[in-house]
Amino acid sequence: MAVNVNTNVAAMTAQRYLTGATNAQQTSMERLSSGFKINSAKDDAAGLQISNRLNVQSRGLDVAVRNANDGISIAQTAEGAMNETTNILQRMRDLSLQSANGSNSKSERVAIQEEITALNDELNRIAETTSFGGNKLLNGTFSTKSFQIGADNGEAVMLTLKDMRSDNRMMGGTSYVAAEGKDKDWKVQAGANDITFTLKDIDGNDQTITVNAKEGDDIEEVATYINGQTDMVKASVNEKGQLQIFAGNNKVTGDVAFSGGLAGALNMQAGTAETVDTIDVTSVGGAQQSVAVIDSALKYVDSHRAELGAFQNRFNHAISNLDNINENVNASKSRIKDTDFAKETTALTKSQILSQASSSVLAQAKQAPNAALSLLG
């Protein structure tokens, strides 16, 4: 083998392997210290792009879960307040039934009305003050808002919160009263025992309901018969013997038309709008009508509470799905980008050994040209 002084090929070879081992060692240290096997585009350009897209999706899913939880919190806040609204309406109904009893004097009914007025004020206070993050929930101003429960645009769900004030038309309906009162001697006559209600239901469908009373029935029995034949309207009788018909806005849209022989005998008058805000139990007739008004309001509140319950259940399922997606997205991102510590530790040990070996060989290779000096000896 030739002895060269100007060119030390062995040293150059050792230097090349040392550089490679050092670079590999630095790469392993970077991966182990950062926890990522992709730290720049040069490590894996395609993998970096995919992992970044997955990271964006994961962050979006995290935000979507927070949004969904906010939606649940709003629904829970509203539904909790509406639970108290239900309690108030139930108490008002109890008081109305109490006032309708004939054992009460005028002064006692006035006292009952005072409590109903106070309860009505509290019902409205709850509707006006229930809020979440500064947004009023139950006074009609919340209306409909969207909740972003997905990682991409367009993945939103709408939530509607209805007006729970007592003067809301859906917290009542329309009252119709017969022009003439019927005393205890009045009876349903043969050939004039039918009354037909023509109306539109809440979905806008035409409804025609015919009730045939029995010959000889008195006015109280007529009211009982109507209530037994249909739930679209509620019938009662006031202290003057006048038939009262109430159509709740949660069931009937628009006015009710009356026809038939019995309707002609009763001579039903034009309707008057009534809500929980306007109920008056200082008379028997008013107390009877109040029960129907409050029943309509209770159905309205209960229906909306059911909607909020369904909304909460839907969002709970949405959160479970988002968590599942996020788990799989992060698992995929981890497989692409995260460091395999067992594998990388092995690579680091290998590069350290090669680095040490290359350094030792390089030191020996640098001594080779000294052999030329011995020839000059």
UniProtKB/Swiss-Prot annotation:
Keyword Coiled coil attached: yes
Keyword Secreted set for record: yes
Gene3D superfamilies: 3.30.70.2120, f41 fragment of flagellin, N-terminal domain, Flagellar export chaperone, C-terminal domain
Coiled coil: 103-129, 310-339
Location in or out of the cell: Secreted; Bacterial flagellum
Molecular function GO terms recorded: structural molecule activity
A single GO cellular-component term on record: extracellular region
Superkingdom of origin: Bacteria
Main location class: secreted
This protein's UniProt keywords: Bacterial flagellum, Coiled coil, Secreted
Family classification: Belongs to the bacterial flagellin family.
Note from the entry: V.cholerae is able to differentially regulate the flagellins within the flagellum maybe to produce flagella which are particularly suited for motility within a given environment.
UniProt subunit comment: Heteromer of multiple flagellin subunits including FlaA, FlaB, FlaC, FlaD and FlaE.
Function: Flagellin is the subunit protein which polymerizes to form the filaments of bacterial flagella. FlaD is not essential for flagellar synthesis and motility.
Protein's name according to its UniProt entry: Flagellin D
Organism: Vibrio cholerae serotype O1 (strain ATCC 39315 / El Tor Inaba N16961)
